Each structure stands twice: as C-alpha cells, then as structure tokens.
C-alpha cells in the first residue's frame, strides 16, 4: 500500500530532529533543471507567478539562488520533518519511532513541484514551487508537462518494490493531477473527510487537510497493508460511513461539536 500526500508551503528547519537517518531524493537531476528555470525569474515575476507578497517572493528568489544539489544534513532536512502545514499537523512525524519511520519510508510518498516524489527521509532544501504553477520549461508550459510520466513511473517502482497494487490518495487534486492514473499499476482508494456544519456534511478545507495527516499516521502506526483496514479510522471523532462510500472512495464523517 502506497500513501500519497501533498507537500506544505510552511517549512520548519529549526525544530529538534527525532532521527538522524536520511536518504537522498531520487529525481534531483530533474530538480536541478527546474531550479535553472526558476533562477531566471525576478522577485516581482515570482510574486506574480505564485501570487505571493513581495517579501515572500524575495525569500523564494534567495532560496532558488542558494539551492545546490549536494544535500547534507547541514544544508537540508528530511522532507517529512521539514513540511509543516495542516496535513503535517495531523501526521505529527516528529513523534514517530524509528520503526514508524521505517514503515513510512516504504509506504508514504510526498508529491512535490520541485522534487517530483519524496520519501519521508529524503533530504530537501527549502523551496516553494507548487505543482499548479505555470513555470515554463524545456518540456512544456507548466510543471505537469515537465514531470510527464516521471512521477507515475517512480510510484510504480515503489509499488513493485513492495509487491503491492494499492494507492491511498490523500493528496490534493492539484498534486494528484501530476499522477497518470491509467499508467499507475494500482487500484486507487481516495478517503474523503466530511465535517458537519449547520446540520450538513461537507468538506471543510482545514479539517480535511488535517484529517489526511491523521489517516496517514493511522496507517503508519498500525502498519496497515490492506485498504479495508482503513475503515477502522476513528481519530478525533471521525467515523466510516459505508452508505456514502463507493468503489474507490471511502467517506468519513464527523459531527459538529456542540
């Protein structure tokens, strides 16, 4: 079983590390090509392209310029410990045991605009390059064209290595669009998280993102290997709703706190 999650915009390169183990990203040659393109952008161009403030654009221009391919624990950090968004709040990788990291390294993948696919312990240098950004490059007009089949092929390699054919899609639509489902040698299961609001169940972005992290943690902590085991997920008040679920989509609901 291979779990897919999105990266985060917020990064943490200061907190104490729970493990010193690390691996290196497998697609760094591609990352270098994107950095080459990104370095051509001025801070105002970055601000427009990414729809971010001038201050953030300046920070990210500096990151592109400082980036270099020789990753070490001194200039980079393990991806699962560097990302700090809502998904990662639910995941809480900073509390993982070494055995948890072992399982995650085999079964969890982070999709990335710059790095393509990251394993949890892959070192990464700080960046911001969302998958949906229209960064022109030698392979096309955006990052989807740049990555083409590369991400899908890398996921197929991971599935083959564990002798499995199930992908748990906990990534956002923006990131999962970088995967070619028809070329993926797997059944795709998508958990959906609905929260009650004024008597109606709907996707509330903040809660849904955190729930994706909670589900990832649930799979890792319990060493789950079969999709039917996911229905036991009950973290923070969520419960499986079989009636709302369908082939390939597992629906989890949570009542409003009153």
Swiss-Prot record:
Gene it is expressed from: yaaA
PANTHER family xref list: PEROXIDE STRESS RESISTANCE PROTEIN YAAA, PEROXIDE STRESS RESPONSE PROTEIN YAAA
Gene source species: Escherichia coli O17:K52:H18 (strain UMN026 / ExPEC)
Signal peptide: none
Record's protein name: UPF0246 protein YaaA
A biological-process GO annotation: response to hydroperoxide
Cellular component GO terms, alphabetical: cytosol
Alphabetical list of InterPro entries matching this protein: YaaA (IPR005583)
Family of this protein: Belongs to the UPF0246 family.
HAMAP family per the UniProt record, alphabetical: UPF0246
The organism's place on the tree of life at top rank: Bacteria
